[in-house]
């Protein structure tokens, strides 16, 4: 059954950008898709209605989305003015990094609530970080070094952990049974 579900991966170790259009996202609306890559997204403008891991979300400006490998997504509706910043790491690259050890305590929460609204100042900080990465990515041979890509991935993962610690009610909440199973 799982083989019948389309899979989304990235052909390069790392990509970053802000040029995803509603037209591109709408191509993922016809069917659910399994994420093989690790993807981080910041909604800057517009909105997206999507189902992530069987939960429907309305993604709006200042929402940060974490899509670790193994999650499922289906896009339902995208506004014409949508603007998203994104960073993605291929499944091949992610498979060579022991990120699970870093986020073990938060992985169940991330799978349960992958969309996190950020305060405007924090969202602006992330926009600036994406902008800097996009500029660096556009320079020749800047992002060929796997150690640099690993450092960028680590920054994103640590950033996600801090976001969940500081901007969600989950840090001290008891774990649901699904979260306990995911953690195991």
Regions picked out by a protein language model, each given a short descriptive name:
Residues 49-51, 67, 73-79:
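Short beta-strand His + acidic residue motifs that chelate non-heme Fe in jelly-roll/DSBH
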């Amino acid at each position: 059954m799982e083989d019948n579900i389309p899979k989304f991966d990235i052909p390069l170790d790392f990509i970053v950008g802000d040029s995803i259009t509603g037209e591109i996202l709408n191509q993922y609306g016809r069917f659910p898709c399994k994420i093989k890559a690790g993807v981080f997204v910041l909604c800057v403008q517009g909105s997206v209605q999507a189902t992530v891991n069987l939960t429907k979300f309305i993604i709006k400006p200042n929402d940060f989305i974490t899509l670790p490998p193994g999650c499922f997504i289906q896009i339902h509706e995208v506004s014409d003015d949508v603007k998203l910043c994104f960073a993605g790491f291929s499944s091949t690259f992610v498979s060579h990094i022991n990120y699970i050890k870093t986020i073990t305590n938060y992985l169940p929460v991330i799978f349960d609530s992958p969309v996190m609204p950020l305060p405007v100042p924090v969202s602006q900080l992330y926009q600036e970080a994406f902008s800097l990465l996009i500029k660096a990515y556009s320079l020749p041979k800047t992002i060929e070094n796997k150690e640099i890509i690993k450092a960028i991935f680590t920054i994103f993962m640590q950033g996600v952990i801090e976001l969940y610690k500081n901007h969600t009610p989950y840090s001290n909440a008891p774990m649901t049974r699904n979260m306990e199973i995911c953690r195991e």
